[in-house]
Structure formats: structure tokens, C-alpha cells
Amino acid sequence: MSTLKADTIQSTSGGAATLTKQVAAKTWSNTNAAGTTINGSFNVSTLTDTGTGIQTIAYTSAMANAIYSATISMASDAANHEWLDSQATTGIAAKHYTGSAYADVATMWQIIGDLA
């Protein structure tokens, strides 16, 4: 058995290695729904607060089509409902409902699919 140890992996031209023939998150983000704060992200250009409990992220690099896997996790402590809405090649929206009203909560996003 061989062991590969490396600090940097580059393409043959010396640039960054591209993710091909792999299933890896093409977008991830940790956002604060009470405003437009992005705590950390990859391939996210903006966060739009479109209303209480509703937020939309825009991708820096578009997806190849609107058929991709999107998951969210929202910070809440009750029997709440979260769902994704308006899935497009350029971004996606998430909504959070407490059972009686929409509420702003921190949201963690992960998008898997092909980039354009």
C-alpha cells in the first residue's frame, strides 16, 4: 500500500486542480437570515433578505441547469418547517415557518450538481 502526502495539488499547468468526475458541493453557505450577512460561503455572491423567514442566495458561478440537489439546515428549536423555493441556475430561496408565522433563522446551505 502506498501513502500520498501533499500540501498542494495542482493541474499539469500549475494552476488549481478542477473538480471533475467528482460529486462535491459546488456551493455552500452559512447565512444569518436577519439581514444579509454571509458568515462563510463558497460560490455565493449575494444573500437577499426577501422578507421575514425568506432568503435567497445567488451563485457566483451558475449551475448547468435547475435540476440539482439542494439541502438546507436551519437553526431552530421547535416543530418548524423549512423548504427550498425558486430553484434556478443562478440561485435558490429558502423559507422558514414556525407553524404560525415566518421567522428569521440562521441557514446552512449545500448545493450539489454540475456547474455551467
Task: Indicate where each model-derived feature is located.
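Intrinsic low-complexity, repeat-rich intrinsically disordered segments enriched
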Residues: 1-39
